[in-house]
Every structure is written in C-alpha cells, then in structure tokens.
Amino acid sequence: FSTIQNERERLIRAYRKTIRFTAFITLPIMAGLFVTAGPVIRLLLKEEWWPSIPFFQLLCLGGCFTILTAINNNFIKVSGRSDGILKIEYYKIAFTVAVVLLTYREDVLTMVAGLVVTRLLVYIINMIYTAHYTGYRFSMQLMDLLPYAGLSILMTLLLLPIGGWIENQLLLLVTQAAAGTVIYIGTAYITGSKILKDSLELIRKKNCLLYTSPSPRDG
C-alpha cells in the first residue's frame, strides 16, 4: 500500500510541475497574442479583415483552456480511465449545442464568445474529473495556475494602453512584444517563480554541455 501511495504522490508532483510549466509558457503567449492582435492583423491582412481582430482575441482566450484541458486529458489517460475523457466530450457537445441554440439569432461575435465560455466550463469539469481519477485536487490545480494567470493579466493590463500612444503598427507590435517579455519575465523573477528558475537552470546546463562537449577532432 505504501508503495502505491508513494507512486501516486510522485505522479501528482509530476502533474503539478507539468501544469505549472504549461501555464508559465502558454498563458503569457496567449495574452501576448491577445494584446498584439490589432497590429499583427493590420500588418499582415488587408483592411477588410480588420474586423476579425476581436474574433482572434476570443480564440486566444479559448486556446488557453483548450491546451490545459488537453494536458489534463493526458493525466486521465495515464490513470487508465480513458472513459472519463469520453464523458467530458459529452459535456463539451452538450454545451456547444446549448450555446448555438442560445446565440444563433445574435451576431457571430456573441456566438464565438459563448463557445469560449464553453471551453472554460469544459476545462472546469475536466479539472474535477482529473481530481477524481488522479488525486490532483481541483484546488491544487487552481493554485498552480493562479500565479501565472495573474502575471499574464497584469502584463495584458499594462500593455493595452500602449495601443493608444503609438500609431505606427510595426513599432507598436515591437514595443508591445518587448515590453510584455520584460514585464512577464521580470515580474516572475522578482516574485521568485520556481518554474522560471528551473527553466534558467536548464538553459544554463544545456549551454555548459554545449561548450564542454568534445569536438569530433578530439575523439
């Protein structure tokens, strides 16, 4: 019994680290895409496509939940309960149908917003199933996500006003991308993010291996 318990705790630690690392990378990228959607689309597409900016922003929000749901699905598969994933898909279909029925008379943006809410609801249900099958509790996963969600929201709030100060779209894109990187990484460093420290340590070790590895001539 103790061996099984130790294995379960080891898996939960691995799950937590995976979720934290995924959130650390994914959430700021999606937030950055949300913020820079305007300059990116205006630079790459013709003016008739500019109204698609809010759609792209909503898809970025929904993408956060989709990625995290996929990670949790892998945890459920590891636990040997793939039937749980099928149950979650039933919820997803039901929510999607409900959103379409409730919003089909509204504009397309409202329908897309409803589908983003669907992804959020599916992710919440997914967290509950993950907790049931793996022991990775709902509250535990929420606490693993909140620091990086908070940093991403802070970054977004600080970057959005820049759009009203710079008219040149290329300069705006570069400024927002650079400022966002500095704000996110800087704040994570100041607050002592363990994932950031682990990532920097991994990069340092890889660089050490790269510079210390023998060349073919030395062989």
What are these regions (language model features)?
Residues 91-94, 147-159:
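Hydrophobic membrane-spanning alpha-helices of multi-pass integral membrane proteins
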Residues 54-100, 104, 108-132, 176-181:
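Short runs within selected transmembrane alpha-helices of multi-pass transporters and secretion channels
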Residues 214-219:
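A short, hydrophobic C-terminal helix/tail in secreted or cell-surface proteins
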